[in-house]
Swiss-Prot record:
It is found in: Cytoplasm, Perinuclear region; Endoplasmic reticulum; Golgi apparatus. It comes from the Eukaryota. May play a role in vesicular transport from endoplasmic reticulum to Golgi. PANTHER family: TRAFFICKING PROTEIN PARTICLE COMPLEX SUBUNIT 2 (PTHR12403). Component of the multisubunit TRAPP (transport protein particle) complex, which includes at least TRAPPC2, TRAPPC2L, TRAPPC3, TRAPPC3L, TRAPPC4, TRAPPC5, TRAPPC8, TRAPPC9, TRAPPC10, TRAPPC11 and TRAPPC12. Interacts with the heterodimer TRAPPC3-TRAPPC6A. Keywords: Cytoplasm, Endoplasmic reticulum, ER-Golgi transport, Golgi apparatus, Transport. It comes from Bos taurus. InterPro entries: Longin-like_dom_sf, Sedlin, TRAPPC2L. GO terms for cellular component: cytoplasm; endoplasmic reticulum; Golgi apparatus; nucleus; perinuclear region of cytoplasm; TRAPP complex. This is Trafficking protein particle complex subunit 2-like protein. GO terms for biological process: endoplasmic reticulum to Golgi vesicle-mediated transport. Belongs to the TRAPP small subunits family. Sedlin subfamily.
Length: 139
């Protein structure tokens, strides 16, 4: 099950972080923050090839004993990070990709909102509801 979903701006500050359960929120914030180094490393390793790709899924960034951290980057260099419970072995790579595509589509809807200023924290109820349903659906 996805236990944390984060949207990170191009300048590496959080636009949105949602975690379940909330008692481990600081732990998940730390995991998301440390994964940004791996994201930057993968992006720089891809170099120009990243621009030509339509699929911006970075895959597994790093596993821990209890969790796996996955990444995705948009064309505008906004990063999506998802922390998944390692005990859920039924969750496949293509399901993670699908979750990131849903997240990207919902993020695009937020960006198209004329009342949203790019770079501000995401406070959209529709976006939050989509993330919550995505986290519950995977359970």
């Amino acid at each position: 099950m996805a236990v944390c979903v984060a949207v990170i701006a191009k300048e590496n500050y959080p636009l949105y972080i949602r975690s379940i359960p909330t008692e481990n929120e600081l732990k998940f914030h730390y995991m998301v923050h440390t994964s940004l180094d791996v994201v930057d490393e993968k992006i720089s390793a891809m170099g120009k090839a990243l621009v030509d790709q339509r699929e911006l899924y970075l895959g597994l960034l790093y596993p821990t004993e209890d969790y796996k951290v996955y990444g995705y980057v948009t064309n505008s260099k906004v990063k999506f990070v998802m922390v998944v419970d390692s005990s859920n072995t039924a969750l496949r790579d293509n399901e993670i990709r699908s979750m990131f595509r849903k997240l990207h589509n919902s993020y695009t809807d937020v960006m198209c909102n004329p009342f949203y200023n790019p770079g501000d924290r995401i406070q959209s109820r529709a976006f939050d509801g989509m993330v919550t349903s995505m986290m519950i659906q995977v359970c």
